[in-house]
Amino acid sequence: MSHAEDNAGTRRDFLYHATAATGVVVTGAAVWPLINQMNASADVKAMASIFVDVSAVEVGTQLTVKWRGKPVFIRRRDEKDIELARSVPLGALRDTSAENANKPGAEATDENRTLPAFDGTNTGEWLVMLGVCTHLGCVPMGDKSGDFGGWFCPCHGSHYDSAGRIRKGPAPRNLDIPVAAFVDETTIKLG
């Protein structure tokens, strides 16, 4: 056996390992973009939670913000709205579920649909809801519209009361309430 034949196996082994390593790197470079595209994009991550300053919202008025591509109604209700919503018996409602992500499975009483203040008291003053009709996804009109002093969806005639509960029309459910909480006296965190 000559000296050249001893090196042939070593050269062959080197070429085999170098080719295999190159194949692994090329495969990884080709597969990584496919895996990485499944991660949430920066705009989705940014919209997961937002903070809304409600210090300028006067009693009896409403603020609409965009969250996750949908309108969110933030209403600071007056005493008349609160009394009207709390006077409705549960049996008079078409949907008796609160549809509140903060209180899953709760009944649709006014207290279960409103947002407690930063100190934990729930006076019923703050109501935060997705502004999307549960019938076909239209945006209801606010400013105490409709027959029940809440919201009215002009697309197909759904009427919601001052707590966002369906009272009349084709909508099957109450307006949804997103995960929300006060983080201080004047700031609400959505999501």
Swiss-Prot record:
Disulfide bonds: C138-C155
Top-level taxonomic group: Bacteria
Binding site for [2Fe-2S] cluster: C133, H135, C153, H156
Gene Ontology MF annotations: 2 iron, 2 sulfur cluster binding; metal ion binding; ubiquinol-cytochrome-c reductase activity
Domain Rieske per the UniProt entry, residue ranges: 94-189
Membrane topology: Single-pass membrane protein
InterPro entries the record matches: Rieske_2Fe-2S (IPR017941), Rieske_2Fe-2S_sf (IPR036922), Rieske_Fe-S_prot (IPR014349), Rieske_Fe-S_prot_C (IPR005805), TAT_signal (IPR006311), TAT_signal_bac_arc (IPR019546), Ubiq_cytC_Rdtase_Fe-S_su_TAT (IPR019470), Ubiquinol_cyt_c_Rdtase_Fe-S-su (IPR006317)
Transmembrane region(s): 18-35
Keyword Nucleotidyltransferase attached: no
Protein name: Ubiquinol-cytochrome c reductase iron-sulfur subunit
Record lineage: Bacteria, Pseudomonadati, Pseudomonadota, Alphaproteobacteria, Rhodobacterales
